């Protein structure tokens, strides 16, 4: 596991972590990589696909990266034709909608020097580059109202037939709210985590890159949902299919 495992490569202005890799992931870059492998016909196509998945219109630039799942990643990849929503199909009238105001300008303002992933820069040079990034981001972006449909946690825990409708290999977005996270990054988020639904021997698992376990692992789906119950931060899940 490595937070922010991918960047814009050696020509990146702010983040020169590789455009793709297979040794380290965070939750999003794991999904990015697996999805690109599913969609690609060969290595050249993989390189193209991962840029299409990670950046708006495949424009490899920090400010064009799909930083926010509900504001960027999902709508841009839906537009690409790479994903299709299953949430309503699975849950029907049990489906709820989460809304949030993503404050991009504030998010850029809260960025710290560790976002500048260029090994040869001195600490002072990183601070200077961070100032450039904040200025660029704050000029480009304003707040955006976003919404995402989800299946409530309590419905998933009490209704095994509902869980059985989730196809193996589906994308799972964990929808919720976290005031502590908001205070750290400068904006509310209504998608807290992402991974894949995997069926194995009649059991449903979530396959994900875990910051706690520091690796990619399978966690029994119900057990993972229950870990959020004492925190009260998880509302439910949004389910999407990869359109290979």
Regions found by a protein language model. Name each.
Residues 172-244:
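C-terminal soluble interaction/assembly domains
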Residues 148-163, 182-184:
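Short alpha-helix capping/helix-loop boundary micro-motifs
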Residues 50, 73, 156-157, 166, ...:
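Generic hydrophobic, helix-prone segments enriched in Leu/Val/Ile
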Residues 10, 56, 160-162, 185, ...:
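Short, flexible coil/linker segments at or flanking structured domains
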Residues 50-51, 153-157, 178, 218-222:
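Short amphipathic alpha-helical surface micro-motifs
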Residues 2-151, 167, 176-178, 191, ...:
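Acidic/His-rich structured neighborhood in mature extracellular/periplasmic domains
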């Amino acid at each position: 596991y490595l937070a922010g495992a991918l960047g814009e490569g050696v020509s990146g202005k702010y983040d020169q972590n590789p455009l793709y890799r297979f040794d380290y992931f965070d939750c999003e870059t794991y999904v990015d990589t697996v999805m690109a492998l599913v969609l690609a016909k060969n290595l050249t196509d993989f390189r193209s696909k991962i840029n299409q998945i990670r950046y708006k219109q495949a424009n490899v630039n920090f400010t064009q990266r799909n930083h926010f799942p509900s504001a960027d990643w999902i709508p841009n990849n839906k537009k690409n034709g790479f994903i299709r929503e299953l949430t309503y199909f699975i849950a029907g009238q049990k489906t709820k909608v989460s809304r949030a105001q993503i404050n991009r300008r504030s998010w850029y303002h809260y960025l710290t020097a560790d976002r500048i992933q260029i090994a040869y820069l001195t600490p002072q040079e990183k601070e200077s580059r961070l100032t450039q990034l904040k200025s660029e981001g704050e000029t480009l972006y304003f707040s955006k109202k976003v919404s995402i449909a989800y299946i409530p946690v309590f419905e998933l825990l009490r209704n095994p037939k509902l869980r059985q409708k989730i196809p193996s290999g589906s994308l799972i977005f964990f929808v919720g709210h976290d005031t502590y996270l908001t205070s750290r990054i400068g904006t509310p988020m209504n998608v807290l985590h992402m991974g894949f639904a995997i069926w194995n021997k009649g059991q449903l698992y979530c396959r994900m890159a875990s910051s706690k376990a520091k690796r990619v692992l399978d966690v029994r789906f119900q057990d993972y949902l229950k870990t959020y119950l004492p925190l009260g931060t998880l509302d439910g899940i949004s389910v999407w299919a990869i359109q290979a």
